[in-house]
UniProtKB/Swiss-Prot annotation:
It comes from Shewanella sp. (strain MR-7). It comes from the Bacteria. This is DNA-directed RNA polymerase subunit beta'. GO terms for biological process: DNA-templated transcription. The keyword Thylakoid does not apply. Pfam families: RNA_pol_Rpb1_1, RNA_pol_Rpb1_2, RNA_pol_Rpb1_3, RNA_pol_Rpb1_4, RNA_pol_Rpb1_5.
C-alpha cells in the first residue's frame, strides 16, 4: 500500500518555473525526446484493433494500450510495473504515457522547415542573403546552387540552371561543388560563420548611405545576433529528423460499422512516412537522378503540409475535399489551442437558466431554483448527510438526494447559507458582468435577479439567460464575498459614478411621489412630524401631491464625525415627507425636496456613498427600490392613445412650411437659385418646421392649467403619463414623443442623404403607404448596424485588452515630477467638462499655489478628493498639473500615485490592481452604444453659415492666448498671428469660454477689457484672408507688371478697379521667376523695417491675391494690403462613433492630414514642380533648412516671410497623431487622443474617466526608436521597449559610460500587442505563426509578466489576490538565491551572549 501511495505521489509533479523559453530543436534533441523510430505508415490492425509494430501507433515505442498490461498479455497488473515484455517489447506502465511519449522519423533527405522558409520575412533567405524565390527554386529542385566555388569564377550562393550547371561541369570539372534541394541549403547554412559575419556587418554599418540597404543590413545583423546569442544554429532550420506527436494527441477512434474516425495528422504523417520509405528504397537502388529528385520534392511537400498545410501551393485535402488540419492550424485562430482551450475553458459546478425579476430580494441576494441548487451543491450535501449520520456511505447519500427526501431540503438550506454564488450574463463586457450573490431558494425554474443590478449586467427580462457558478474552496468563497459581492460593486470602474441607480418603474414611482399638485386635497396643512404626515395620508386627509408644511428632524454630521439633530419647518409635499423616512441619517432633506428624476436620484446615491459609506448606501438603495415600485403601482401611470396630444398649431405650421417650399421651387424654376441651394433650403425649412411643431407639442404636453385655492388660473407641470415618463428619465425622450404626437420629420436614404419630403404624419395619426415605405429604410439600416456594431465593438475590446493586459499597479510612488496639465475643457462658448471633473481622484504633480501668491494651496502628491476639489473651485484655480500613467517612471507597471483613485472604490488604488484590463473594459463596454456610421454632411449641417464673429455668452474680461496683434487707427486690435485663441475670464479668474480667432480678426475690445454677455467682440471675413501691415508708410509695388504678373479687373457694380496677381501657372515665361510683393517705404524713400527686427517690411503676394491700393498709396498700421480669396474647405465626411475610436487607437494616418511645421523658422517658397510647391523653412539660428513638397491644391495658412513655430499647422486637415508626437511631444499627443476619444463618447452621453484612455496611450507609447546607441548594445534605428532602454541606460550611467538616446514611437494597438515582450501573449492574439517563428529564432524566453501568459500556462495571474501570491513566491526565490552568510563567532562570545540572555530572562521574572 505504501508503495502505491508513493507511486501516485510521484506522478503529480508540478515544477516551479518562472519563464518559458522557445528555440529551435537540433536533430539530436529530437532524437533524445523520441522513444523509437516510426518506420511504417500502418496504424492499427483492423481485425484485432491492436497497434501495428513500428507503425504510427506502435505500443513498443509509445507505450501500452491498456493500463499495466503488455500487448501480448503476458504481464498484467501492478506487480509487473516497469517490466519490458520480451515477447512484444512493450513496457508495463500506465496508458497515459501514450500522451507524452514521442517518436521520430529519420528523413532520407533533409527538408526545410516551412515556417522559417515562408513566414515573411523568410529567415532562411535573410540568413543566406538570397531571395525567397531563389531558395524555393533550389529546394523544389528547379535549379542548382553553388556551395563551394573552389578556384573557379563562380560565386558561393550563385544560382545555376540545369544547362548552366552542365556547362560549368564541362568547363571546370570537379573544381567546384553545386547541389540542389534542402541538402544544398543545409550546407550553405552550415558554412556561415556567425561571429565573423556579425563583426563584418557591424563594421560596415556606419559607412552605408542608402536607407534601404542600411535597413536590410540591420535586419540581417539582428537575425544573426539572435542566432548567436540564443545558441541556435542556422542549419537547424532544415529538418533531418522529424518528431512524431504522441498517439493519444492524434487519436484513432473505431466507429461502429468497421469505420474509423481519425485525426488529420495521421493522414499527414502517413504521407510523410510513405514517401520517406520510397525515397530510401530508391536511394538504395541508385535510381536515376530525376526520379530521386521528384521523390525528394514530394517528401519536402508532404512535410510542409504536415507542419503548415496550405502555406505553400494548394492545401492537401482529405477524402471530403476539406483541407487537412496541420500542426500549425492546431494552435492558431479562434478554434486553435490558445484561444479555445487555454484562455477560456468550460467549468463544472455551473448551471444556466432564464432570469426573472426579484423585486423583493435584497441587493446581495439572488433567487436560485431549488432544483438547480440541489444539483450545484451536491458534494456539499453528500458530505453533510454523511457527517450528520443520515447516510452511511456516499452511495446512500446519493440515493437520498435522488429520492429528494425531506431531510435533503433541510440540509440544502444549511449548505447554502452564506455560501455566495457567482452570476454571469454573456456577453461579459466589463468586470461587472460577473458578480456574487447569496442564494435564496425559490420554487420554479427561473433565476431571480435583483432589479438594481440589471444596469451593470445590461440585462432585461425578455428571455435573457444567466449562468451560475459555485466557488468551491474557502479562498474562492472569501474572494467572492469580499471582492465580487454586488454590494461591493456600487460604483462603476469606468467613471466612479454609482452603477446601481434605479431605472424605469422605480424612477417613475419616486418621481410621481415627489411631484406637487396645486390645490390638492389637504393643501396648506401643518404637520408636527413626518409620522403625522403618514397618518394623514393613510386616512386620506391629505393626498400624495398636496403642498404642506412639515417640521422635520435632520441629523447633521460634523467634520469630526459627531452627530447633532436639527429641527426645522419646510415647505414640501406629502410624498416628499414620506420619502424622507427612508433617507439615512446624515443626509439633508433638501436632497429629496425636489422633483426626483433619474439624474437627481443618481446624485442622491452618489452623495450618500461619499458621505455615509457603503453600508448605508446599500440599505438606502434597496429602500428606494421598494418605495419606487410601491408608488409606481399606486400611481397607475399608463400609456393610452389620448395621452399623445397633437398640438393644434401643427397643421398651420406644416401649411406655412409647404408654402415656403413652393416659393423656393418657383425661384429655382426661374433660375434664381441653384439645385443644391434649393435642396438645402427645403431641408432647412422642414427641419425648422419640425422643431417648431415639437416645441408646441412639448409645451402642450408639459403644462396644464388649473384653478388654485384662491380661484385663480395657474399653470402647473402636467400629470400626463407619457410626459411624466420622459421627464423623469424613466423611459422615452422628447424625440420619441415627437414621433408619436408631433411629426416624424425628415428621413434619410440608405446612403445617408436626406429625402427632401418629410413625413408630416405622426404615429397617432398613422402613416400612409409612401410614408411607411420611406420609414423602412432607417429601420432596416438600424438593425443591420446593430449586428455589425456588436462584432466591431467586441473586436475593439479584444485589441484593447490585449494591448493593456500586462499593466498592473506594482509600487506606491515612482517619484516622477512629470505630469499632464489639466484645464477645464471648453468648446466654443461652453465649458464641456469643468476642471473638478477632470482632476477628481488624481494626484497633484506640482504644488498648486494660491492665485497670485507664493503660498502652496495643494502640495505635490495630494490625492484630490471631493473636499480638495471644492477648495480648488473656491480659489478658482483653472489649471492643475496632475500625475498620469503616461508619464509614470515605473518599469513593467505603474505606480499608485500616477494612477490616483481607484474609481470603483473611491480611495487610492491598491497594489496588484489590473488597471490595464479595467481600462480596456471601460472603453470597450460602451462600444456597442456608439454609432457605426460616418456622418455625411448635407443640408442643414454643411451650410451652417461660415463663422465670422464671436458673440460671448458670459460676462467677464477678455484674454488672448498666444496672439500677436497691432492697433489700427480706430484703436481696435488686429490679430496678426495664427492659432490665436480668445478667452472670457469671469471675476474669479476662471475661464468660461474660448474661441479660435483667425489671422486678420478685428477685436472690438482691448485685452483685459470687460465684456457683457451677448456682445460681439470679434469680426473677420470668412471668405478672404487679409495680409495685414505691421508698419505705417507708403507702399511700393515690386515685380508687379500688368499683363505679366498681374491683371486689372473692374467690378461692374461699383466701378472700382482692383489688381489680381496671376498664379505662376498662368504667367508667361517672363513672369515665371518674378516675385510680386509690396514693400513699405518711409517719407524719405528708405525701406522700413518690421518693428523690433532687422527684417525689411515687405509682403509677398501669392497667386490670386487681390490688391485694392495703388502704387505709392499711404497706409496705416493694421490696414489690409491685399486679400486672398479662400476656397471654402471641401466638406469632409466626419468619421464618427466606433470607427473613429478604432482609428484613434490604431493611430491611423488620416487621408489628407494637416501639414505641420517640422522646425521653427521663417517660411519661403522654393522652385515649384508641375503639381507641387516647395516649402522651405529657414531656422533663425542659421541651422539646416527644411524643405517639403506640398501639392498645389492644399490650402496653405502661411505666407512667404512669415515665422512659424515647430508643430504649427501649415495646411489644414485632420492632424495625424504621429506628427503631433514627433513635433509637439508626448503631452500634446496624449491630450489630443484623450480629447478626440472623449468627444465621440460624450456625443452618446457616455462618461469615461480620462485615466482609462491614458492607460491605453501609455501602452501605445511603450516602444521607442534608438537614435544613437552610445555604449549600449542596441542598434541605431532599432525598435525597443522604453523600459528596457531606461534600465540599460541606468546601468551605463552607473558605469560612467554613454547612455543610448531614443525617440518615443506611437504604435497602434494591434501593432503594440504584437510587439509585446511576451511571445505567448502575442501568439495568442494574432499572426501566431509569425510571432512563434520570430521567437524561436531568437531563442526568446517569456518571463510570464502579463496576465495572459499566466492564464495560458495555468498559473494564478499576477494581479489582484494573485499579485500577493506571486510577490511572496518571488521574494522566497530571491532569498533562496542569496548566499547564506555564516557569522563566525568564538566560543567565548557565545558563552557571553548566553549569559546575557539568561540574566535578561531572570530580571524579567
Amino acid at each position: 500500500m505504501k508503495d502505491l501511495l508513493k507511486f501516485l505521489k510521484q506522478q503529480s509533479k508540478t515544477e516551479e518555473f518562472n519563464g518559458i523559453k522557445i528555440g529551435l530543436a537540433s536533430p539530436d534533441l529530437i532524437r533524445s525526446w523520441s522513444f523509437g523510430e516510426v518506420k511504417k505508415p500502418e496504424t492499427i490492425n483492423y481485425r484485432t484493433f491492436k497497434p501495428e509494430r513500428e507503425g504510427l501507433f506502435c505500443a513498443r515505442i509509445f507505450g501500452p494500450v491498456k493500463d499495466y498490461e503488455c500487448l501480448c498479455g503476458k504481464y498484467k497488473r501492478l506487480k509487473h510495473r516497469g517490466v519490458i515484455c520480451e515477447k512484444c517489447g512493450v513496457e508495463v506502465t500506465q496508458t497515459k504515457v501514450r500522451r507524452e511519449r514521442m517518436g521520430h522519423i529519420e528523413l532520407a533527405s533533409p527538408v526545410a522547415h516551412i515556417w522559417f522558409l515562408k513566414s515573411l520575412p523568410s529567415r532562411i533567405g535573410l540568413m543566406l542573403d538570397m531571395t525567397l524565390r531563389d531558395i524555393e527554386r533550389v529546394l523544389y529542385f528547379e535549379s542548382f546552387v553553388v556551395i563551394e566555388p573552389g578556384m573557379t569564377s563562380l560565386e558561393r550562393g550563385q544560382m545555376l540552371t540545369e544547362e548552366n550547371y552542365l556547362d560549368a561541369l564541362e568547363e571546370y570539372g570537379d573544381e567546384f561543388e553545386a547541389k540542389m534541394g534542402a541538402e544544398a541549403v543545409l550546407e550553405l547554412l552550415r558554412a556561415i560563420d556567425l561571429e565573423k559575419e556579425i563583426e563584418q556587418m557591424r563594421e560596415e554599418l556606419p559607412s552605408i548611405n542608402s536607407e534601404t540597404r542600411r535597413k536590410k543590413v540591420t535586419k540581417r545583423l539582428k537575425l544573426m545576433e539572435a542566432f548567436h546569442t540564443s545558441g541556435n544554429k542556422p542549419e537547424w532550420m532544415i529538418l533531418k529528423v522529424l518528431p512524431v506527436l504522441p498517439p493519444d494527441l492524434r487519436p484513432l477512434v473505431p466507429l461502429d460499422g468497421g469505420r474509423f474516425a481519425t485525426s488529420d495528422l495521421n493522414d499527414l504523417y502517413r504521407r510523410v512516412i510513405n514517401r520517406n520509405n520510397r525515397l530510401k528504397r530508391l536511394l538504395d537502388l541508385a535510381a536515376p537522378d530525376i526520379i530521386v529528385r521528384n521523390e525528394k520534392r514530394m517528401l519536402q511537400e508532404s512535410v510542409d503540409a504536415l507542419l503548415d498545410n496550405g502555406r505553400r501551393g494548394r492545401a492537401i485535402t482529405g477524402s471530403n475535399k476539406r483541407p487537412l488540419k496541420s500542426l500549425a492550424d492546431m494552435i492558431k485562430g479562434k478554434q486553435g489551442r490558445f484561444r479555445q482551450n487555454l484562455l477560456g475553458k468550460r467549468v463544472d459546478y455551473s448551471g444556466r437558466s432564464v432570469i426573472t425579476v426579484g423585486p423583493t430580494l435584497r441587493l446581495h441576494q439572488c433567487g436560485l431554483p431549488k432544483k438547480m441548487a440541489l444539483e450545484l451543491f451536491k458534494p456539499f450535501i453528500y458530505g453533510k448527510l454523511e457527517g450528520r449520520g443520515l447516510a452511511t456511505t456516499i452511495k446512500a447519500a446519493k440515493k437520498m438526494v435522488e429520492r429528494e427526501v425531506a431531510e435533503v431540503w433541510d440540509v440544502l438550506d444549511e449548505v447554502i447559507r452564506e455560501h455566495p454564488v457567482m452570476l454571469n450574463r454573456a456577453p461579459t463586457l466589463h468586470r461587472l458582468g460577473i458578480q456574487a450573490f447569496e442564494p435564496v431558494l425559490i420554487e420554479g425554474k427561473a433565476i431571480q435577479l435583483h432589479p438594481l443590478v440589471c444596469a451593470a449586467y445590461n440585462a432585461d427580462f425578455d428571455g435573457d439567460q444567466m449562468a451560475v457558478h459555485v466557488p468551491l474552496t474557502l479562498e474562492a468563497q472569501l474572494e467572492a464575498r469580499a471582492l465580487m459581492m454586488s454590494t461591493n460593486n456600487i460604483l462603476s470602474p469606468a467613471n466612479g459614478e454609482p452603477v446601481i441607480t434605479p431605472s424605469q418603474d422605480v424612477v417613475l414611482g419616486l418621481y410621481y411621489t415627489s411631484r406637487e399638485r396645486i390645490n390638492g386635497r389637504g393643501e396648506g396643512m401643518y404637520f408636527m412630524s413626518v409620522a403625522e404626515v403618514e397618518k394623514a395620508y393613510a386616512t386620506g386627509a391629505a393626498e400624495l401631491h398636496a403642498r404642506v408644511k412639515v417640521r422635520i428632524t435632520e441629523t447633521v454630521i460634523g467634520d469630526n464625525g459627531e452627530r447633532t439633530e436639527q429641527r426645522r419647518i419646510v415647505d414640501t409635499t406629502v410624498g416628499r415627507a414620506l420619502l424622507s423616512q427612508i433617507l439615512p441619517a446624515g443626509l439633508s432633506f433638501d436632497l429629496v425636496n425636489q422633483n426626483m428624476g433619474k439624474k437627481q436620484i443618481s446624485k442622491l446615491l452618489n452623495t450618500c456613498y461619499r458621505q455615509l459609506g457603503l453600508k448605508d448606501t446599500v440599505i438606502f438603495a434597496d429602500q428606494l427600490m421598494y418605495t419606487g415600485f410601491r408608488y409606481a403601482t399606486i400611481s397607475g401611470a399608463s400609456v393610452g392613445i389620448d395621452d399623445m396630444v397633437i398640438p393644434a398649431e401643427k397643421y398651420t405650421l406644416v401649411a406655412d412650411a409647404e408654402a415656403e417650399v413652393l416659393e423656393i421651387q418657383e425661384q429655382f424654376q426661374s433660375g434664381l437659385v441653384t439645385a443644391g441651394e434649393r435642396y438645402n433650403k427645403v431641408i432647412d425649412i422642414w427641419a425648422s418646421a419640425n422643431e417648431k411643431v415639437s416645441k408646441a407639442m412639448m409645451e402642450n404636453l408639459s403644462t396644464e392649467t388649473v384653478i388654485n385655492r384662491d380661484g385663480v388660473e395657474e399653470k402647473q407641470a402636467s400629470f400626463n403619463s407619457i410626459y411624466m415618463m420622459a421627464d423623469s428619465g424613466a423611459r422615452g425622450s422628447a424625440a420619441q414623443i415627437r414621433q408619436l404626437a408631433g411629426m416624424r420629420g425628415l428621413m434619410a436614404k440608405p446612403d445617408g442623404s436626406i429625402i427632401e419630403t418629410p413625413i408630416v404624419a405622426n404615429f397617432r395619426e398613422g402613416l400612409n403607404v409612401l410614408q411607411y415605405f420611406i420609414s423602412t429604410h432607417g429601420a432596416r439600416k438600424g438593425l443591420a448596424d446593430t449586428a455589425l456594431k456588436t462584432a466591431n465593438s467586441g473586436y475593439l475590446t479584444r485589441r484593447l485588452v490585449d494591448v493593456a493586459q500586462d499593466l498592473v499597479v506594482i509600487e506606491d510612488d515612482c517619484g516622477t515630477h512629470e505630469g499632464l496639465t489639466m484645464k477645464p475643457l471648453i468648446e466654443g462658448g461652453d465649458v464641456v467638462e469643468p476642471l473638478r471633473e477632470r482632476v477628481l481622484g488624481r494626484v497633484v504633480a506640482v504644488d498648486v499655489m494660491y492665485p497670485g501668491t507664493e503660498d502652496v494651496l495643494a502640495p505635490r502628491n495630494t490625492l484630490l478628493d471631493e473636499a480638495w476639489c471644492d477648495k480648488l473651485e473656491e480659489h478658482s484655480i483653472d489649471e492643475v498639473i496632475v500625475r498620469s500613467v503616461i508619464t509614470c517612471d515605473t518599469d513593467f507597471g505603474v505606480c499608485a500615485a500616477c494612477y490616483g483613485r481607484d474609481l470603483a472604490r473611491g480611495h487610492l488604488i491598491n497594489h496588484g490592481e489590473a488597471i490595464g484590463v479595467v481600462a480596456a473594459q471601460s472603453i470597450g463596454e460602451p462600444g456597442t452604444q456608439l454609432t457605426m456610421r460616418t456622418f455625411h454632411i448635407g443640408g442643414a449641417a454643411s451650410r451652417a453659415s461660415a463663422e465670422n464673429n464671436v458673440q460671448v455668452k458670459n460676462s467677464g474680461s477678455l484674454k488672448l492666448h498666444n496672439a500677436k496683434y497691432v492697433t489700427n487707427t480706430d484703436g481696435k486690435l488686429v490679430i496678426v498671428s495664427r492659432s490665436s485663441e480668445l478667452a472670457i475670464i469671469d471675476e474669479l479668474g476662471r475661464e468660461k469660454e474660448r474661441y479660435k480667432v483667425p489671422y486678420g480678426t478685428v477685436l472690438e475690445k482691448l485685452e483685459e477689457a470687460s465684456v457683457e454677455a451677448g456682445d460681439i467682440i470679434a469680426n473677420w471675413d470668412p471668405h478672404t484672408h487679409p495680409i495685414i501691415t505691421e508698419v505705417a508708410g507708403s507702399i511700393k509695388f515690386v515685380d508687379m507688371i500688368d499683363g505679366v504678373t498681374m491683371t486689372r479687373q473692374t467690378d461692374e457694380l461699383t466701378g472700382l478697379s482692383s489688381i489680381v496677381i496671376l498664379d505662376v501657372g498662368q504667367r508667361g515665361s517672363a513672369g515665371k521667376e518674378m516675385r510680386p510683393m509690396i514693400r513699405l517705404v518711409g517719407a524719405d524713400g528708405s525701406d522700413l523695417m518690421i518693428p523690433g527686427t532687422e527684417v525689411p517690411a515687405q509682403y509677398f503676394l501669392p497667386g490670386s491675391a487681390i490688391v485694392n491700393l495703388d502704387d505709392n498709396a499711404q497706409i496705416a498700421v493694421g490696414d489690409a494690403l491685399a486679400r486672398i480669396p479662400q476656397e471654402s474647405s471641401k466638406t469632409r465626411d466626419i468619421t464618427g462613433g466606433l470607427p473613429r475610436v478604432a482609428d484613434l487607437f490604431e493611430a491611423r494616418k488620416p487621408k489628407e492630414p494637416a501639414i505641420l511645421a517640422e522646425i521653427s523658422g521663417t517660411i519661403s517658397f522654393g522652385k515649384e514642380t508641375k503639381g507641387k510647391r516647395r516649402l522651405v523653412i529657414t531656422p533663425a539660428d542659421g541651422g539646416e533648412q527644411y524643405e517639403e513638397m506640398i501639392p498645389k491644391w492644399r490650402n496653405l495658412n502661411v505666407f512667404e516671410g512669415e515665422k512659424v513655430e515647430r508643430g504649427e499647422v501649415i495646411a489644414d486637415g485632420p492632424e495625424a497623431a504621429h506628427d503631433i508626437l514627433r513635433l509637439r511631444g508626448i503631452h500634446n499627443v496624449a491630450n489630443y487622443i484623450v480629447n478626440e476619444v472623449q468627444d465621440v463618447y460624450r456625443l452618446q452621453g457616455v462618461k469615461i474617466n480620462d485615466k482609462h484612455i491614458e492607460v491605453i496611450i501609455r501602452q501605445m507609447l511603450r516602444k521607442c526608436v534608438i537614435t544613437s546607441a552610445g555604449d549600449s548594445e542596441f542598434l541605431e534605428g532599432e525598435q525597443v521597449e522604453v523600459s528596457r532602454v531606461k534600465i540599460a541606460n541606468r546601468e551605463l550611467v552607473e558605469q560612467g559610460k554613454v547612455p543610448a538616446t531614443f525617440e518615443r514611437e506611437l504604435l497602434g494597438i494591434t501593432k503594440a500587442s504584437l510587439a509585446t515582450e511576451s511571445f505567448i501573449s502575442a501568439a495568442s492574439f494574432q499572426e501566431t505563426t509569425r510571432v512563434l517563428t520570430e521567437a524561436a529564432v531568437g531563442g526568446k524566453s517569456d518571463n510570464l509578466r502579463g496576465l495572459k501568459e499566466n492564464v495560458i500556462v495555468g498559473r494564478l495571474i499576477p494581479a489582484g489576490t494573485g499579485y500577493a501570491y506571486h510577490k511572496t513566491r518571488n521574494d522566497a526565490r530571491a532569498k533562496k538565491d542569496e548566499p547564506v552568510v555564516v557569522n563566525k563567532i568564538t566560543a567565548s562570545e557565545a558563552e557571553q551572549n548566553l549569559a546575557d540572555l539568561l540574566n535578561l530572562a531572570g530580571s524579567q521574572d
